[in-house]
């Protein structure tokens, strides 16, 4: 789900597992009732199944909801297990998650701007 996200978007993950049979209305109700967030806001909501090999993303586009689904053929997402919790993550943490890494990286390697060999 390597999509270009709109500017200034909030990204939320539903920690723990979600019943992946839920569709747009069920996921939007979960966002509103369980997490007390606005599903119509400028936010991307991510949900993961029990096996951690598939995720759904819910996004309000102004004229309707967009529901995206990704199933990994090999591997699992490093999904936080805090049941009944929603967590806001940064765009960088979103990229880590989609690439199979944990959203809680201890340290990242900084890029070197200088290109001089001594």
Locate the predicted segments by residue.
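Polybasic/polar functional segments that serve as interface/processing modules
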Residues: 1-118
